[in-house]
Amino acid sequence: MPTYNQLVRFGRKSKTRKTKSPALESNPFKSGVCLVVKTVTPKKPNSALRKIATVRLSNKRTVNAYIPGEKHSVKEHDRVLVRGGQVPDLPGVKYHIVLGAYDIAGVKGRKQGRSRYGAPSKQVAVTKK
């Protein structure tokens, strides 16, 4: 408990919140260039080969970004769009690649949750007579 004199001299400082995706610099998305595409294994107790890419963002920062969905078309030197979002069982992966943006195709054959995976709608276009 501070004394009255300490409050007069220093005041109360509000705590600053630490962002979970600092490389985005308060932006919802950042574009970047893919440097390396690789697979990594998750923490215990999970087991898989998760696909990640090392991306150099437009602000010159390098981050590891997760590639969601089954199969992907991410290659080295592709232009990608990166959003925030951690992968719970991959330490150090705090970003996701947005599928269906720039050089990256969406997941083919996706019926549900299509917007997350950049999959197009299966609705037939109405033709005018």
Swiss-Prot record:
CDD domains given in the database record: Ribosomal_S12
GO molecular function: rRNA binding; structural constituent of ribosome; tRNA binding
A cellular component term, taken from the record's GO annotations: small ribosomal subunit
GO aspect biological process, one term: translation
Residues the record lists as 3-methylthioaspartic acid modifications: 89
Alphabetic keyword roster: Methylation, Ribonucleoprotein, Ribosomal protein, RNA-binding, rRNA-binding, tRNA-binding
Function: With S4 and S5 plays an important role in translational accuracy.
Subunit and interaction comment: Part of the 30S ribosomal subunit. Contacts proteins S8 and S17. May interact with IF1 in the 30S initiation complex.
PANTHER family: 30S RIBOSOMAL PROTEIN S12 FAMILY MEMBER (PTHR11652)
NCBIfam families, per the entry: rpsL_bact
Family the UniProt entry places it in: Belongs to the universal ribosomal protein uS12 family.
Protein name as it appears in the record: Small ribosomal subunit protein uS12
